[in-house]
Amino acid sequence: MKAMRLEEEWGPEHIKEVELPDPEPGIGEIVISMKATAINPRDLILSRKGYGRHSGNLPLIPLADGAGHVCDQGAGATKFQIGDLVCPIYNRYWLTGTSDSAHSGGSHGGPL
């Protein structure tokens, strides 16, 4: 698969296109073939290691938003089927409406 990734240096100017092996889904996981992505301010901050130790380690893919379709699924993954259109979310508790304290702590993922 092709990916845009920070390899050895921080900063958006160091993001490079790389070829990576296709990911294998784990138990209860799906693999998404991303078809559209958006680079937002959070991604730029992350690419500059602007979140300090919470920025993760290199190499990483600085991406929070996108959409695609399910292209593979692991054992026990039953909520989505291959071919389903999906849009991964950054906060797993905030699915609709205005955010409130119930959504606190729901941030999921970060650097890929």
Predicted regions and their residues:
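Short structural boundary motif marking the start of a folded domain
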Residues: M1-M4
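Cofactor-binding loop segments of dinucleotide-utilizing enzymes, especially the Rossmann-like FAD-
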Residues: E8
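Short N-terminal binding/cap micro-motifs at the start of the first secondary-structure element
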Residues: G11-I15, P41-D43
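Short beta-strand-initiation
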Residues: I15-E17, P111
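Short, acidic/hydrophobic/Gly-rich beta-strand patch recurrent on exposed beta strands
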Residues: V18, I45-R48
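Glycine-rich beta-strand-centered segment in the early N-terminal region that forms part
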Residues: P21-T37, G50-S101, G109-G110
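General nucleic-acid-binding
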Residues: G106
